[in-house]
Design a protein with these regions (language model features):
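Class I S-adenosyl-L-methionine
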Residues: 2-165
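Conserved phosphate-coordination/catalytic loops
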Residues: 104-109, 206-213
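Conserved proline-anchored active-site loop of SAM-dependent methyltransferases
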Residues: 111-142, 150-154, 172-206, 218-223, ...
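Conserved Class I SAM-dependent methyltransferase catalytic core
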Residues: 114, 208-268, 274-280
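Conserved beta-strand segments of alpha/beta enzyme cores
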Residues: 147, 167-170, 255-258
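Structured loop/turn residues at beta-strand edges in well-structured enzyme cores
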Residues: 164, 181, 186, 254, ...
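Flexible, glycine-/basic-rich loop-and-beta segments that form/coincide
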Residues: 268-313
Length: 313
């Protein structure tokens, strides 16, 4: 990327930030293109595909939210995060890059839930192996600062993370990070991940039903003993599935704390309608706890998070 293009993207983010400060909605993708054009960003010159503009907008919102004070009360936090997420237009374009890399970002209200389930302490090291535009990690920056490890293989999204000034940034295939010396030196206490559902870099366009489990296993191998991994994955990844069975056979010391589906409409704004689930996994824990809920919804989210805090002690 040239310095000129980087400067234009910077001014684009400044303009976006003004919208966020005023809580002004960007109503359509056409409006987003007009805003980019106002900053002299030209298609085919400064960006190749529209989704890059959306990625910048998403990264700008993530960075903005990372500097806000999220309400402590669970329902207030969810409403607060959802109100800002609605400022971006609904994303429906399925670009070749997004399909290949399975780049479907985590909605920030769900990201916040994943973080709560992780029970993160102030001295924990936290890894996000497929960080995208920083939807999850951005909500941790105020409290953890340089103890966040982000990895993103896509070059443009990796650049967006660099622009957000993370201290520990890598650009590697998340399905192989356990094999890399620089990652084996890391022993994260907590891992929060939203891996590709059905493709890996190796298989490219071909569907790989073990894609999610390969990413999961690679990250799990790095996890500290007694550590906790929070997984957002497609709903078909469940006990008895090929993917989970593969992980179970290769990670016999794991303990499944929670296994619950979430509302499929949650991902609507991010360009996919897949039904998803959240798994909370611990590595060889001293005390095995269990959160029995099979579904997460608006009615029980407070109960689940309170139970999680109580069990954590």
């Amino acid at each position: 990327m040239t310095d000129s293009t980087a400067s234009k993207f910077y001014h684009f983010k400044v303009l976006l930030n003004e919208f966020f400060l005023d809580k002004k909605k960007i109503r359509s993708t056409t409006d987003l293109v007009k805003m980019a054009s106002h900053c002299e960003l030209k298609p085919g010159v400064d960006y190749a595909q529209f989704h890059q503009l959306y990625d910048v907008a998403e990264a700008a919102l993530n960075e903005f939210m990372g500097n806000q004070d999220i309400p402590a009360f669970i329902r207030n936090a969810m409403v607060y995060l959802q109100s800002y997420a609605q400022l971006l237009p609904t994303f429906t374009e399925r670009s070749s890059d997004k399909s290949l890399f399975q780049q479907f970002s985590t909605p920030q209200d769900i990201a916040w839930v994943l973080i709560q389930l992780a029970n993160i302490k102030i001295d924990d090291w936290v890894l996000e192996p497929s960080a995208g535009t920083g939807s999850i990690s951005s909500l941790l920056k105020k409290s953890l600062a340089n103890r966040i490890i982000v990895n993103e293989i896509h070059p443009f999204r990796n650049w967006l993370l660099t622009e957000q000034a993370y201290h520990n940034i890598f650009r590697e295939d998340a399905a192989q990070i356990h094999n890399l010396p620089k990652f084996r030196e890391l022993v994260p206490d907590k891992i929060i991940m939203n891996p590709p559902f059905s493709r890996t870099i190796q298989t490219k366009a071909k569907v790989d039903v073990l894609a999610g489990s390969k990413h999961l296993l690679s990250s799990y191998k790095l996890l500290k003993k007694g550590g906790r991994l929070i997984l957002l994955i497609n709903a078909s990844f469940n006990k008895g599935s090929r993917g989970y069975t593969f992980f179970q056979q290769n990670a016999p010391d794991h303990h499944l704390v929670m296994n619950a589906t979430i509302d499929p409409e949650t991902f609507k704004q991010k360009g996919t309608h897949f039904e998803t689930r959240i798994m909370v996994i611990e590595k060889n824990p001293e005390k095995k706890i269990h959160i029995p809920h099979a579904e997460i919804n608006e009615d029980n989210i407070s109960e689940i998070l309170e139970l999680n805090r109580y069990n954590h002690g």
